[in-house]
Amino acid sequence: GSDLVSGFWGKVDAHKIGGEALARLLVVYPWTQRYFTTFGNLGSADAICHNAKVLAHGEKVLAAIGEGLKHPENLKAHYAKLSEYHSNKLHVDPANFRLLGNVFITVLARHFQHEFTPELQHALEAHFCAVGDALAKAYH
């Protein structure tokens, strides 16, 4: 599973995929916008999809998820600071981590239609789920 994801991950453009995924999250699940009030205009799907702060943060998030691939045995420790930050400072509902993982899967499937096998989807979902669990650690 993780070898499959690692091999695939090198093809993923964090800027394009990450930005699109975070923008999609904010459009599809509008209540998540409350965590991004400092990001400027989130008034429409078009505004969100062209918002430079949204796109940059999406890239940052996807890059951080990719970094987790280097620490598969120790995700909770790897993401401990981010978990604390999202829990204590941002008060992000941890259910949103799963939503974002689902949106990433959707966007990756859209961009990599021919390579997006059920096996790859399974491996990606396992990784996103593990990252979400690690990020939710500070909530327990």
From Swiss-Prot:
One Gene Ontology term of the biological-process aspect is: hydrogen peroxide catabolic process
InterPro entries according to UniProt: Globin, Globin-like_sf, Globin/Proto, Hemoglobin_b, Hemoglobin_oxygen_transport
Tissues in which the UniProt entry reports expression: Red blood cells.
Q: Does the keyword DNA-binding apply?
A: no
State where heme b binds.
Answer: H57, H86
One cellular-component annotation, GO: blood microparticle
Q: Residue limits of the Globin domain?
A: 1-140
Q: Which GO terms describe its molecular function?
A: haptoglobin binding; heme binding; metal ion binding; organic acid binding; oxygen binding; oxygen carrier activity; peroxidase activity
Which UniProt keyword terms apply here? Heme, Iron, Metal-binding, Oxygen transport, Transport
Q: Does the keyword Heme apply?
A: yes
Per UniProt, subunit arrangement is:
Heterotetramer of two alpha chains and two beta chains.
Q: Which family does it belong to?
A: Belongs to the globin family.
Q: What does this protein do?
A: Involved in oxygen transport from the lung to the various peripheral tissues.
- Please identify the protein, giving its name as recorded: Hemoglobin subunit beta
